[in-house]
Amino acid sequence: MQMMSLEKEAAMETKTAEQRSLDYRNAMARLGAAVNIVTTDGAAGRAGFAATAVCSVSDNPPTLLVCLNRNASAYKVVKANGVICINTLAAHHEVLSTLFGGKTPAEERFAAGSWGVLETGAPVLEDALVSFDCRIREAHDGGTHDILICTVVDMKINAGDEALMYFNRRYRVL
């Protein structure tokens, strides 16, 4: 039996970690989720990003969590402002989601759609299925992302029964 060199062993471990990461991303593509645009505004400026990693934590007090990639263009602005609005998208918002999910400059992102504000001042998409206006209460390290624990301070609920979903790397309507 031959002994493996330390370099070869390290290369195999790296490849294994890379493969595990790829396998995980492929598996997560099979987990359907609502599409949201998360926005912020305040002293650090206005920014927003598309997110599917959003879920309820508690109803007393009303609390949501959002996962924010540390490499996202909105990362520093969101963290500095300390407020967000989670806007859950309707079926007709696919183009808007694409704008907020890519490299489009913030000004162009917000030029699309009609925006208002609630208590925190974070942009509220006027025709979102629901908008959760939040203050960021805590942030936790989650690897490549921060896990933001957010207290809901106001909500806007609109009529509509077709949600924009993301499943298997494609938009779907539910």
Swiss-Prot record:
It catalyses: FMNH2 + NAD(+) = FMN + NADH + 2 H(+). GO terms for molecular function: FMN binding; FMN reductase (NADH) activity; FMN reductase [NAD(P)H] activity; riboflavin reductase (NADPH) activity. Its EC number is 1.5.1.42. The keyword NAD applies. GO terms for biological process: nitrogen utilization; uracil catabolic process. It comes from the Bacteria. Keywords: Flavoprotein, FMN, NAD, Oxidoreductase. Catalyzes the reduction of FMN to FMNH2 which is used to reduce pyrimidine by RutA via the Rut pathway. Belongs to the non-flavoprotein flavin reductase family. RutF subfamily. NCBIfam families: RutF. This is FMN reductase (NADH) RutF. It comes from Agrobacterium fabrum (strain C58 / ATCC 33970) (Agrobacterium tumefaciens (strain C58)). The gene is rutF.
